[in-house]
Structures are given as structure tokens and as C-alpha cells.
């Protein structure tokens, strides 16, 4: 594996994690600032759609990793994507809002995708 392959994947995932945080911030502003439930739900759907495409979008970068890491990354990203796809099928804004956050998550802590970015960076 090239160090660049892990770095490229980590960079991509970091960009996606930042996009998710931005969507979440917009959703919070919409619901708390405007009381717009429909707008909030639309933002949660946007978040879930972005995450549901994660495994597919990252695939070329994952394939550049050495086989063991590629398999590990593929499985992990597929779990993120499957959870998001399920949340879209269920249609629950609560489920969508909880994506990437374990039950014990505290505000200010990194979410699961941000933690995974750090793990992928450690591969390089």
C-alpha cells in the first residue's frame, strides 16, 4: 500500500465528514431558528443520502489500498452506507439524525466517521 492511498482516502472521508457536520448545523439552525420541521427533515435526508453513497463514492480510493486494508475499509464504509440507506427507507428523521452517533456520544466529541478518518490516517 502506498502511504498516499491511505492519505487520499482519509482526505476524502474528512471532506465528507465536514459536509455532514455542515448539513447538521444547517438542520439545527432550521429547526431551532425557524421552527421549520419540513426543512429539518429535508436536511436529515440530505445527510442520509450523502452517507448512503459513501461506500460507492470511496470505492476507487479503497481499491488503491493494500488488500487487507481495502477489505477492512470496504466493510466499514459499507456499514456506514447501509445504515444511512436503511434510515432513508424507514423515513425516520430521528434515525437519520442519529447516524454516526453511538448512544453514549457526548456533544463536542467526534462522530464515528471522524473517528474513522483518524484511524485511516494512522495507516499511512
Model-derived features: where do they sit?
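Short terminal alpha-helical segments
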Residues: 1-42
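Compositionally biased non-globular segments, especially hydrophobic aliphatic-rich helices
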Residues: 8, 58-61, 87
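Generic structural concept
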Residues: 10-17, 45-48, 52-55, 81, ...
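Short, solvent-exposed, charged loop/turn and helix-capping segments
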Residues: 50-79
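Short, charged, amphipathic alpha-helical segments
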Residues: 37-49, 74-82, 114
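Amphipathic alpha-helical binding modules
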Residues: 78-124
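Short, flexible coil/linker elements and helix-boundary hinge sites characteristic
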Residues: 17, 21, 32-34, 66-70, ...
Amino acid at each position: 500500500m502506498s502511504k498516499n492511498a491511505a492519505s487520499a482516502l482519509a482526505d476524502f472521508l474528512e471532506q465528507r465528514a465536514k459536509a455532514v457536520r455542515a448539513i447538521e448545523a444547517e438542520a439545527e439552525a432550521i429547526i431551532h431558528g425557524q421552527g421549520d420541521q419540513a426543512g429539518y427533515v429535508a436536511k436529515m435526508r440530505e445527510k442520509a443520502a450523502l452517507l448512503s453513497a459513501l461506500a460507492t463514492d470511496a470505492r476507487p480510493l479503497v481499491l488503491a489500498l493494500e488488500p487487507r486494508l481495502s477489505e477492512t475499509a470496504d466493510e466499514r464504509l459499507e456499514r456506514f452506507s447501509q445504515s444511512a440507506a436503511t434510515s432513508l427507507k424507514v423515513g425516520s428523521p430521528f434515525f437519520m439524525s442519529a447516524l454516526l452517533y453511538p448512544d453514549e456520544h457526548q456533544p463536542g466529541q467526534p462522530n464515528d466517521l471522524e473517528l474513522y478518518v483518524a484511524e485511516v490516517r494512522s495507516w499511512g
